């Protein structure tokens, strides 16, 4: 009579391999979900910063200097730039994210417009929006 031990050992080996495969698939799914979560969080933060910049520009009638004085950042000619670190705090060092607002010509009297972009340090645009406001008559 033959022993059933090799058959049981083979069955256990197959079960361990199936378990290892399932564990590897689960780890890959969790890693993918973590990456997606980080991208979505960055996009959410970019939207918040862009909307804050847009609201500040509208409240200041498109005056980049006054908007920068209120929200932060620097104005360089016709561009307002805010440098942000990986925690979305303003930084003077190497930025992880950059918010840029620049005026855009509308071709219409009494209508001001600006383009606001938030980009990662690798150049990938996270969020972009245009903001318009009514300029005061002079």
Please give the residue ranges for each predicted region.
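Alpha-helical transmembrane segments
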Residues: 20, 24-27
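N-terminal leader/signal peptides at the extreme start of proteins
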Residues: 1-7
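Short hydrophobic/aromatic segments of transmembrane alpha-helices and their interfaces
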Residues: 2, 12, 28-29
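Flexible, low-complexity segments enriched in proline/glycine/serine and punctuated by aromatic residues
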Residues: 7, 14-18, 30-138
């Amino acid at each position: 009579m033959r022993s059933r031990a090799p058959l049981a050992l083979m069955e256990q080996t197959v079960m361990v391999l199936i378990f290892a495969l399932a564990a590897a698939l689960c780890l890959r799914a969790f890693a993918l979900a973590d990456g997606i979560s980080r991208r979505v969080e960055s996009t959410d933060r970019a939207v918040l910063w862009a909307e804050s910049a847009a609201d500040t520009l509208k409240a200041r009638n498109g005056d980049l200097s006054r908007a920068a004085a209120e929200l932060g950042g620097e104005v360089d000619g016709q561009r307002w730039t805010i440098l942000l670190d990986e925690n979305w705090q303003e930084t003077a060092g190497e930025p992880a994210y950059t918010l840029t607002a620049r005026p855009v010509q509308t071709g219409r009297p009494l209508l001001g417009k600006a383009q606001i972009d938030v980009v990662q340090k690798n150049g990938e645009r996270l969020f972009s929006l245009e903001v318009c406001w009514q300029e005061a008559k002079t």
